[in-house]
A protein has these predicted regions:
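Conserved ABC transporter NBD signature motif
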Residues: 79-95
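ABC-family nucleotide-binding domains
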Residues: 177, 183-184, 188
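Q-loop/switch helix immediately C-terminal to the Walker
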Residues: 102-105, 110-127, 132
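Helix-to-loop junction immediately C-terminal to a conserved catalytic motif
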Residues: 71
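A short, flexible loop at the N-terminus of ABC-type nucleotide-binding domains that lies
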Residues: 13-50
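Hydrophobic anchor residue at the start of the ABC signature
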Residues: 163
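Conserved ABC ATPase "signature" region
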Residues: 130-146
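Conserved ABC ATPase signature
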Residues: 149-156
Length: 228
């Protein structure tokens, strides 16, 4: 991969309790990705068990790019991503219901009301939890916003709608980017409780990209991204 004066991300990761390989939900091997103007990942590998994983790094460290690669929204130049023993690139359609990802910066959903978007998710995610959605809707104080189009919501309210759907999806791999942007303190506190609850779900990995740990969240794995 030729990338001029590329700068790549190096990986440091820490696991709580020395978790063993037989609990691995997501395996990434030799991942390489570069934009035309810069390199991002070079022979990047990690194994993540069920639970909560924090991808931590400063702005432009590659956090969002990594989530988009894991979601299949970007295609790596090399490497392999395996979810629950299945290579995602070998069976993208079959695995679509196993991965939840919505880029909070995208405007693709903006014309939909929050309710319409949420109502469409159970058909895609067989492990959808309607009771969890009701709890998240209440916890994030979203009831008054459900019939508004997403473009009419504040940054924080839109993120809360997306996270409510993500957390209720039951997807074995759930990807959440910069979760606290625009959130008020009560919503951040509820998010910590919701993530703590999700952490106990067997066989499910929730990957959160953020620049620091969220207080009160039982992170099982912390992956630090740093430019080299």
């Amino acid at each position: 991969m030729a990338v001029g004066a590329a700068r790549f991300v190096k990986l440091l990761f820490f696991r709580k309790g020395n978790m063993v390989a037989d609990n691995v939900v997501l395996q990434v091997e030799g991942l390489c990705f570069a934009y035309p103007e810069c390199g991002v990942l070079n022979q990047w590998s990690v194994a993540l068990p069920a639970g909560l994983a924090l991808v931590r790094g400063d702005e432009s460290s590659g956090k969002t790019t990594l989530l988009r690669l894991l979601a299949g929204e970007l295609t790596a130049q090399a490497g392999r991503i395996t979810l629950q023993g299945v290579c995602l690139s070998d069976a993208p359609t079959a695995c679509a219901h196993k991965v939840f990802w919505v880029d909070p910066r995208s405007g693709d959903l903006d014309k939909l009301t929050a309710r319409t978007w949420l109502d469409g998710l159970p058909a895609r995610y067989p492990l959808w939890d309607a009771a969890a959605l009701a709890a998240h809707t209440e916890g994030f104080s979203l009831n008054e916003h459900l019939d508004k189009p997403l473009y009419a919501l504040s940054t924080g309210s839109k993120r809360k709608v997306l996270m409510a759907g993500a957390l209720a999806s039951g997807a074995p791999l759930t990807l959440i980017d910069e979760p606290v942007a625009g959130l008020d303190k009560p919503s951040i506190q509820y998010l910590a409780r919701a993530l703590t609850s999700v952490a106990a779900q067997p066989g499910r990995l929730v990957v959160v990209a953020h620049y620091e740990k969220l207080a009160g969240v039982p992170w099982g794995t912390v992956v630090d991204l740093a430019r080299t």
